[in-house]
Amino acid sequence: ADMGIKRIEFIDDIFNVKEKDFIAFFNKVIQDNLDVSFFFPTALKGDLLTKESIDIMMQGGAVGVNVSLESASPRMQKVMRKNLDIERFRENLEYIAKAYPSAVTTLNTMHGFPTETEEEAKMTLDFILSMKWIHFPYTHIVRIFPGTDLEKFALNHGVDKGAISEAIDKSYHEVAPTLPFSRDFTE
């Protein structure tokens, strides 16, 4: 029955972790001929997508794809315990841009992780610039929150606890005093 719902946003950054279930969901949407647009504002796992899952998702009503790279540095991926396959991530974004040019693509990145170098941050910027088409490439500055594993890591690598406290109230686009490299690089 048509209940008047035309847009659904999934606030779930692991919605596509189980590819079989992800594909089954969109196959059901297609089978039931639902006229609904789907959005993923908190991002999908970009390296876990496949051409098949991308095709089914787009045919099933996805308007675009939001993915989070965070960093294009393999070392920083390990530090963050994200460990995504950067090349597969790139291939999937390129496929979406080529096969679905009207799909709205959003890419989330961050810089300013403790121990990150300017060269590693530049790897992420170079990744963004190398992409043929991204509608919304976002770069945020890392915030270190008290009581987290990231805070422990930062303190173990010389980040001042006072700088962490000072950074808490800053917006994600403001330069944090915890930045591990030149402020000029970020601005």
What are these regions (language model features)?
Residues 104, 119-187:
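C-terminal accessory regions of radical SAM enzymes
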